[in-house]
Regions:
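A conserved helix-loop-beta module that forms one wall/lid of the active-site cleft
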Residues: 88-156
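ATP-dependent carboxylate/acyl-activation modules
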Residues: 4-5, 223, 280, 330, ...
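Internal nucleotide-binding/catalytic subdomain
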Residues: 156-300
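ATP-binding N-terminal substructure of ATP-dependent carboxylate-amine bond-forming enzymes
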Residues: 1-96
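General beta-strand structural signal in soluble alpha/beta enzymes
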Residues: 5, 30-31, 67-68, 93-96, ...
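Active-site "cap" helix and flanking loop/linker of ATP-utilizing ligase/carboxylase catalytic domains
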Residues: 250-272, 289-352
Length: 352
């Protein structure tokens, strides 16, 4: 089969690295890829958010399976558009349609979704109006965090230490458009205390198989200081106890979300990722992502004992239950090398 990996980061290098040894892989392409993926397959000069360009490449290179790394092409409907290509032989996609991807692309949708389906999460309010949000933070019912509703590359969560700082954050997001349209609506939610955990799982729209538990480190500087980033490093552990715990959490947070999305007419295929926090009242979901985590993927895939191509194919065909995913015992860590000025100076044209 001809495979296409969409994305340009270290996450996509890890995916391409694993797919390069898959039994299903004939030719491997990356769009746009990077210097690392160039040694594994063929890089195509196509941006990850260039949906028409990707669709043309799928036809030109006779792609059978598309594995999408970042969230943006998914929210732009890449998986949906792929279904419209080659009616006689449509390419398969490891990644959800735009409707299911809203679980990441809209924090207000995700929070309301969790509430509808009984998934434990923090209390919250959603605001479109700066004045209403400003009045709320003057006498909030709980310590709070502020989240931009839209996609912000992991940099849309703010933990103010005072009402004045919170007001400045709201004005920057809602008036100054510091994150563009992503901050025009905000979620103000209860600030929970506890250790955070990244819970990822393979999903075929009906069932979920959990990956080992992992943990990313979001703060820019040493000793958990500095602003939040997309992640400066991650660890993962695949001991038998960790895998058992991970699957138990997945039954509530991942399978519950998978079933909820299917009930609402948006079945989820791909990697479903729940950001959890272990509170004194039990685990709660902070957020959902509709794709492999970055940098968690770089720590998880070296522990995967199964054929990643076969797993993706089983998910895309809705037959994951027939393919038990295996992990080798051990642990893995990854450290991010970031360009100067990250995360202040970041964007699609600025390498991390």
């Amino acid at each position: 089969m001809n495979l296409l990996v969409v994305g340009s980061g270290a996450r996509e290098h890890a995916i391409a690295w694993k797919l390069s040894s898959s039994s299903i892989t004939g030719r491997l392409y990356c769009a746009p890829g990077n210097a690392g993926t160039a040694g594994l397959g063929i890089n195509l000069d196509i941006r990850a958010d260039d949906i028409p360009g990707i669709l043309k490449a799928v036809l030109d290179y006779d792609i059978d399976l598309v594995a999408v790394g970042p969230e943006l092409p998914l929210t732009l409907g890449l998986a949906d558009r792929l279904k419209e290509l080659r009616p006689a032989k449509p390419p398969l996609c490891f990644g959800p349609g735009a409707a299911a991807a809203r679980i990441e692309s809209s924090k207000s949708f995700a929070k309301s979704f969790m509430r509808r389906h009984g998934i434990p999460t923090a209390d919250f309010r959603v605001f479109d109006d700066l004045g209403q949000a400003s009045r709320f933070i003057q006498a909030p019912p709980w310590p709070f965090v502020i989240k931009a509703t839209g996609l912000a590359a992991g940099k849309g969560v703010f933990l103010p230490d005072s009402p004045g700082e919170a007001e400045a954050i709201l004005e920057s997001l809602m008036l100054g458009k510091s994150l563009g349209d992503a901050g025009s609506q905000v979620v103000i939610e209860e600030r929970l205390q506890g250790e955070e955990l990244s819970l990822l799982g393979f999903c075929d729209g009906k069932s979920v198989q959990a990956m080992p538990p992992s943990q990313d480190h979001k703060r820019l500087l040493e000793n958990d200081a500095g602003p939040n980033t997309g992640g400066m490093g991650a660890i993962a552990c695949a001991s038998p106890g960790a895998l058992t715990r991970s699957q138990a959490l997945a039954d509530l947070f991942l399978l519950g979300a998978c079933k909820g999305l299917a009930e609402e007419g948006s079945p989820f295929v791909g990697t479903l990722y729940a950001g959890l926090i272990m509170t004194k009242d039990g685990p709660k979901a902070l957020e959902y992502n509709c794709r492999f985590g970055d940098p968690e993927t770089q720590a998880l895939l070296p522990l995967l004992d199964s054929d990643l191509g076969e797993v993706m194919l089983a998910c895309a065909r809705g037959r994951l239950e027939e393919y038990p995913v295996r992990w080798r015992q051990g642990s893995c860590a990854t450290v991010v090398l970031a360009s100067e000025g990250y995360a202040r100076d970041s964007g699609p044209d600025v390498p991390r």
